[in-house]
Amino acid sequence: MQINLPLPTIILILYIIYVIFSIIMNKIKFNAENLEELDGEFIFTFISKIKKQQIYFNINEVKLCILTRIFIRQGTFKTINFNILLNDGYSLRLKKKRDCLLFLKVCREKKTELYQKILSMIPADMTVISILEKELDNFKG
């Protein structure tokens, strides 16, 4: 039994397989990201392509932290994302709410000037800052 498919059909099937594979890999990458903290020292674990990698850094090595996305619904954050630039040239992207809140909590406790700089980047009124403070107070990392 031999199946003869036209070339456009074969290309379409391969494209669908590729799209499904890339969606699955993105979900695996997102679920594998993790930020751990101990006394101002961080370990950020992520998957780059297929290999698992870790970046170790201290809160004092953070050069710049940019708030890239924030969505608030019903008085709480649904989405909050950060890009963190380190002194040695590395950059990290925190996409999970838990990781972002952990980073902000350590900034508030250990490096207040960075925390104030992050708060000044929030393009909104005091309501957003009060929601952020409430979330940080309730956060148990």
Give short role names for the model-derived ranges.
Residues I47-S48, L67-I70, K95-K97:
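Surface loops and adjacent helix of pleckstrin homology
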Residues L67-T79:
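Short acidic, Gly/Pro-enriched loop/turn segments at secondary-structure junctions
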Residues I3-L5, F44-K51, T76, L101, ...:
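Short, aromatic- and cysteine-enriched interfacial helices/patches
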Residues K51-Q54, G89-R93:
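Short, mixed charged/polar active-site loops
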Residues F21-F57, L64:
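Conserved beta-hairpin
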Residues M1-A32:
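Alpha-helical transmembrane spans
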Residues F77-S91:
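Canonical pleckstrin homology
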Residues Y90-G141:
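Terminal and domain-flanking low-complexity segments
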